[in-house]
């Protein structure tokens, strides 16, 4: 299998108070498996870095942590997700996984 396991930052919006139009956004972490063959591009997610500095993300994240927004091809529609880690770290993990997959195929 050539999927890469990462940690995704997931946002959930809800009403801050009953009867008001004020929205509250909370963040959680979850595992996600990404197929590197469907990744279109990756870039730093500075918005999540700001959210971390504002203490809006889960407490178990280090303040030095970086985030990457990954754009995934889904045919005529795309999907973008934010994962924990710098773009270079994420790319290295995807490259390593793709290389391991090719070695498995060559071994037969």
Question: Model regions: which residues?
Answer:
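Acidic, Ser/Thr- and proline-rich intrinsically disordered linker/docking segments
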Residues: 1-4, 26-34, 38-108
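Anionic N-terminal interaction surfaces
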Residues: 1-18
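Active-site-adjacent substructure of cysteine-protease-like catalytic cores
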Residues: 21-25
